[in-house]
């Protein structure tokens, strides 16, 4: 398990998950990439992690479950799971857009995924954590107050 900001990909189509992983490995260096095809295995992995921060790339339909079910299931361990998620869909209908809005998911990509769109979405989420890390390094009083949480 890395000490960085890992990316967790959940897609019931193994080839899609592996393709997304290969694209991300071309530009992402801040953590490890984990790919899951089974929702329950992904949930168990996430709940068992020491660190409750990651970027999630999740298919909206995962066999018998939804990507939103996955995010809800890990939310106690990962309070920002919805904010740190990129939902992918074969058909981004109004219903899916509305589910994203209702769930606080800000990134929705339609298959086939454009590599630049994926990179920009991952970069936006990563940027939030890099800014926070900079603030911790520059402000020792703030860092101490965060460590007491």
Positions of PLM-derived features:
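C-terminal output helix
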Residues: 113-122
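Alpha4 helix (beta4-alpha4-beta5 surface) of REC/receiver domains from two-component response regulators
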Residues: 69, 82, 92-107
